[in-house]
Amino acid sequence: MRTVHRIDPDGVPSQREPGDIDRAHGNGLVATGLRHAYGQLTVLDLDTFTVAPGDRHAVIGPNGAGKSTLLNLLAGTTRTQAGTITYNGQAITRRGPAWRARAGIGRTFQHPRVYPNLTVLDCVRMGGWHHRHQPERTPLEALDLVGLIGYADYPAAALSHGHRRMLDLAVALAGQPRVLLLDEPVAGLTDTDTTRLLDILGRLPGWMAVVLVEHHMEVVAALADWTTVLHHGRRHTDGPTDTVRADPAVTALYLGTGGDDAAHR
């Protein structure tokens, strides 16, 4: 199977602790002092959030904790009200989503966005529009990776919810991101589709950073090395995923008192 991505000349980033930015070279995505409010309601108040090349970083928390707001601010789909965001040492706080996509920050959406009047292949081509010299094989490789190569000429509107999720991922991958932001990628998927998606995400290149907003703890455990817990827009705790999952305070806050059964809610 062909791969969507290629290692560029500087090679694979060296190993580091999750969330530890290579500050000597300014590599990574760094948000500082982010604060966002809707009217009088503050939905996010975060001191720092860092993503280094190759990180697998989950963001969890109850509904309304500010998870999707954080992702939208990182992607540029929501304008930053307060705070700064840098990417590889460059200030991007005022840059919009198209600029960030060109720079290497891709994303999927909580509700998959497709162009219903386009074919599946044309939707993926749209995902890589900012790469002016992108070879035709890149959209095809993205479809191949997510298992939709046989649907390339289908109208996007004809896809099932599960296939739309895969298409949303293919669109993001066609942009050849360095940082991939995933907003509840398994929401509404069957167990079979969830397993398939986990396999796909597990085969992404090691240099690609993944930030995952997710409610399903078994998905978080499978994908993320590092987990940040948000509550009322603030950082409740963070650390290695296994440690966070075992924290009784996190269980009480997020999983409830139902133990392992609650992890599937």
What are these regions, as identified by a protein language model?
Residues 2-265:
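Glycine-rich phosphate-binding loops of nucleotide-dependent enzymes
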